[in-house]
C-alpha cells in the first residue's frame, strides 16, 4: 500500500488499526512498511495500536497462501485473526454490482467468512453482536 501523507495522517489519527492483508508476498512487504510507520508514529507520541491483521484473498489450493499466513502467524501471533477471507468469485463480483457481499451472496463462503471475522473482532472487544435482519 501507498504510505503517503494521507495514509500516515490517518494512521496517526487512529486509535487502532486493522490491516487487511492479501495472501501474497507483496502483501508481506506492505505489512512490514505499515508496521514500521506505526512504530515511527508511536515514537512521536501517538497511542495507535495494531489491533489485528486480517488475511484476505486466501486460496487454500496454493502453497503461497498457506506460506504467507504461516509467516504472519510467526511474527504476529496475537494480532492475526483466525478468520480468513477466501478468494471467491462472488466476493469479486459484489463491488461490480454496487453491492456488499451480504447483498450479493449472503449465504456464500465470502459472506460467512466476513461474519466469522466480525464475530471474532467483537469477541476480542467483548462486544455483543447485533443480528442483521
Description of each model-found segment:
Residues 41, 121-124:
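Hydrophobic helix-cap positions at the C-terminus of alpha-helices
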Residues 95-116:
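C-terminal boundary of histidine-terminating zinc-finger modules
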Amino acid at each position: 500500500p501507498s504510505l503517503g501523507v494521507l495514509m500516515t495522517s490517518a494512521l496517526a489519527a487512529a486509535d487502532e488499526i486493522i490491516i487487511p492483508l492479501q495472501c501474497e508476498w507483496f502483501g508481506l512487504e506492505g505489512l512490514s512498511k505499515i508496521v514500521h510507520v506505526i512504530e515511527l508514529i508511536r515514537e512521536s507520541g501517538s497511542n495507535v495500536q495494531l489491533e489485528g491483521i486480517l488475511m484476505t484473498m486466501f486460496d487454500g489450493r496454493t502453497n503461497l497462501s498457506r506460506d504467507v499466513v504461516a509467516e504472519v502467524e510467526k511474527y504476529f501471533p496475537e494480532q492475526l485473526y483466525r478468520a480468513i477471507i477466501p478468494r471467491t468469485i462472488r466476493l469479486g463480483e459484489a463491488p461490480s454490482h454496487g453491492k456488499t457481499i451480504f447483498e450479493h451472496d449472503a449465504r456464500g463462503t465470502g459472506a460467512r467468512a466476513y461474519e466469522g471475522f466480525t464475530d471474532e473482532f467483537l469477541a476480542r472487544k467483548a462486544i455483543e453482536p447485533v443480528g442483521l435482519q
